[in-house]
Amino acid sequence: MSNLFSYENPIMQLLMKIGDLMILNVIYLGCCLPIFTIGAAQAGLYTAMKVMQDPEDDTSLVAAFFRGFKAGFGQVTLAWGITTLITLLVLAAGYLGHFGYGLPAWICILPVVISCWYTAQIPAFHSRFGCTAWQLVRNVWFLIIAHPLRTFGTMVLTWLPFGLLIYGLYTGDIFEFMAMAPIWITLYFGTAWYFCYAFLKKPFNVLIEHFNQTQNATAESSAEALPEAEEAPVE
């Protein structure tokens, strides 16, 4: 019976992990209340997930979240805010084009999907590679092109609640969305970001390895270019 409550028990570890995800979920929603901080809050979740999935890192998950939130508050908020604004403008233009000018629905929806796809990767990229807003805007495209399936999966998990809300408003029935409110509030976002980080872990490790190899090659080239020191003559 004592083994049931042991930290080594797989069931106990699972319950503890679920509890951690619920805590992070509530903190994330609280940090999203000023809407412009959503991107930074997502960066905080990715930082916390990195700690959670690293058995050698014993950093507090809450501390890791706020560290990522603080680090991404400037650059991620700027890049995420700009791309989100563009997404909303594209969504409005698509709505007008479809209902006002009779354009096919897929022509209106495709730019929105691409924009959402792109925006979802910004906090993830910054959480692993601290960089400027311009570097985020540029490098996220390369990540999407190199790993379309993994980044598409993160896009679906990131925007699923918002998509269901839009669909409910469009059909005039948001009962199903509201019925899932306990899941959104307690568990969804923490769990979704857990899988998002798992999706992107391998691509990020490849990028880190490539970067380290490039740095080592550059250092070796610089060392070879240095002239050999001549021995001083002995008097």
Question: Where do the PLM segments sit?
Answer:
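Helix-coil boundary and N-terminal low-complexity module in membrane systems
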Residues: 1-108, 115-235
